[in-house]
Amino acid sequence: MSWCSSPDAVFHLAATGLLLQIAVPCLCSAAMNTHTRQPISHPTAEHLLAWYDRHHRELPWRTSPAMAAQGKRADPYHVWLSEVMLQQTTVQAVKPYFLKFLAAWPDVNDLAAAPVEDVMAAWAGLGYYARARNLKKCAEAVAREHGGVFPDTEEGLKELPGIGDYTAAAVAAIAFNRQAAVMDGNVERVISRLFVIDAPLPGSKPAMKAKVAALTPADRPGDFAQAMMDLGATICTPKRPACALCPFNGACLALARDEPERFPVKAAKKAKPVRLGAAFVAVNTSGEILLRRRIDSGLLGGMTEVPTTAWTARMDGGTDASHAPFVAGWQAAGVIVHVFTHFELRLTVYRAQVPDGLQTGPDDGWWEPVTNLDAQALPTVMKKVITQAIPSACRPENRN
């Protein structure tokens, strides 16, 4: 056993003025010695599945090995819903949304029949809202064209709206036990370290996927896919991987070089462009906020917002009160910053107190009580805007 003297691995116990230092075994890669590594020369599905059977994560959408042994099969609807939600989103963030969706729409036919406004409102806060629109379209296609039954092959799944290579492979493997190569960010990290793939992402993805395909077994391919994800999420983490606990540590080339954290290699990120705009929070005497619905296409399509200007890269464009949707006593309330995938948005926020019954035009939205904001499909950026203008608006005490 290797013992670590780093500050992170020393516990200090203070009792009646006595200070104790207790050394603990170190699980990080820097302390790995040859006698702590697994005696395997190359990674195999067998080693990983043995680890997974003991250490898998319990997740609400997952069929565990014990459940599978009792004859329970994965629900394709649950697998598909969770995989769409998990794209670029953490497990902890997804759990409550997954359970909320299941409570509202227990199967794909229920989701297909749901009003799109309800789906968007339920998705609000999870981000990447095109996923929600495609989720609804996909559910409708499954209900309409497949009788509520998901196709059971990668090719068939990819014909559905919003399902690409990754989601098709994940659903095919996990729900239908197809021998599909499933590769998310966690799997990329594991594979790049196992085989010391020096080419930077995203260009190295095809080489990585070929490695995954070669490792994926014909038996239990779904469990293998989930095991790879769990390994990356819990052991082969981006920082301070717990290499001593890894079932592949004896075959890991990055560990043999003592540099697992160098992988995966990523291309240098370009600075995100900045877009500017203004947002206008109008509050009437009854404590209602003027809201409107964005057009269905494009960024945040179909979501709810307060009136805003266009978001522009021009440094002289659309950030003052002269661009307000109507004349009122607009007062500057500050600036919020929100980072999207491809750009950074800076919105100057204005607030105005207006009388009840103000006519804003037939296409300018509706007045919503502050206490009912949780029921609206407000994306995170709009919650930031409203909170900037009305600090208490999105606090729990103001919710019904």
Q: Over which residues does each language-model region extend?
A:
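Catalytic cores of DNA base-excision repair glycosylases
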Residues: 42, 46-47, 51-244, 248-261, ...
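Intrinsically disordered, low-complexity, charged terminal extensions of DNA damage-control enzymes
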Residues: 13, 18-67, 230-400
